[in-house]
Swiss-Prot record:
<dbReference type="GO" id="GO:0004601">
    <property type="term" value="F:peroxidase activity"/>
</dbReference>
<dbReference type="GO" id="GO:0005833">
    <property type="term" value="C:hemoglobin complex"/>
</dbReference>
<dbReference type="InterPro" id="IPR050056">
    <property type="entry name" value="Hemoglobin_oxygen_transport"/>
</dbReference>
<comment type="similarity">
    <text>Belongs to the globin family.</text>
</comment>
<feature type="domain" description="Globin">
    <location>
        <begin position="1"/>
        <end position="141"/>
    </location>
</feature>
<dbReference type="GO" id="GO:0043177">
    <property type="term" value="F:organic acid binding"/>
</dbReference>
<keyword id="KW-0479">Metal-binding</keyword>
<dbReference type="InterPro" id="IPR009050">
    <property type="entry name" value="Globin-like_sf"/>
</dbReference>
<feature type="modified residue" description="Phosphoserine">
    <location>
        <position position="35"/>
    </location>
</feature>
<comment type="subunit">
    <text>Heterotetramer of two alpha chains and two beta chains.</text>
</comment>
<feature type="modified residue" description="Phosphoserine">
    <location>
        <position position="3"/>
    </location>
</feature>
<feature type="modified residue" description="Phosphothreonine">
    <location>
        <position position="137"/>
    </location>
</feature>
<dbReference type="InterPro" id="IPR002339">
    <property type="entry name" value="Hemoglobin_pi"/>
</dbReference>
<dbReference type="GO" id="GO:0020037">
    <property type="term" value="F:heme binding"/>
</dbReference>
<feature type="modified residue" description="N6-succinyllysine">
    <location>
        <position position="7"/>
    </location>
</feature>
<dbReference type="GO" id="GO:0042744">
    <property type="term" value="P:hydrogen peroxide catabolic process"/>
</dbReference>
<dbReference type="InterPro" id="IPR002338">
    <property type="entry name" value="Hemoglobin_a-typ"/>
</dbReference>
């Protein structure tokens, strides 16, 4: 559960991300594919090379979804319901992959916003991404 301080940290961090959410999403996907090659199996139809238009487009979807979630911290299940359905019923993504992508997102955010990435912000963003992952995997049961 996100505390009021966590919510404030997430909102402040996401305000700094701003219009770069899609770029950060694409960078995090690239990090994930390089660090955890088994994740590539969900994207057999993608050109996974650096700077690929397909990775950038999917990164934008990731960034947009996280921006939506950051704007609805009090109702993540409602904000992410359609995405939860998509990943559980159609794409059938292994839930562990959300944790891997979350880790890569944290690394990406830390690399771009080192000064603002305090231990408290890190903890809040980690809790936020874990909450998003929990919602996205909630319909797997």
């Amino acid at each position: 559960v996100l505390s009021p301080a966590d919510k404030a940290n997430v909102k402040a961090a996401w305000d700094k991300v701003g219009g770069q959410a899609g770029d950060y999403g694409a960078e995090a996907l690239e990090r994930m594919f390089l660090s955890f090659p088994t994740t590539k199996t969900y994207f057999p139809h993608f050109d996974l090379s650096h700077g690929s238009a397909q990775v950038k487009a999917h990164g934008k979807k990731v960034g947009d979804a996280l921006s939506n979630a950051a704007g609805h911290l009090d109702d993540l299940p409602g904000a992410l319901s359609a995405l939860s359905d998509l990943h559980a019923y159609k794409l059938r993504v292994d839930p562990v992959n959300f944790k891997l992508l979350s880790h890569c997102l944290l690394v990406t955010l830390a690399s771009h916003h080192a000064a603002e990435f305090t231990p408290a912000v890190h903890a809040s963003l980690d809790k936020f991404l874990a909450s998003v992952g929990t919602v996205l995997t909630s319909k797997y049961r």
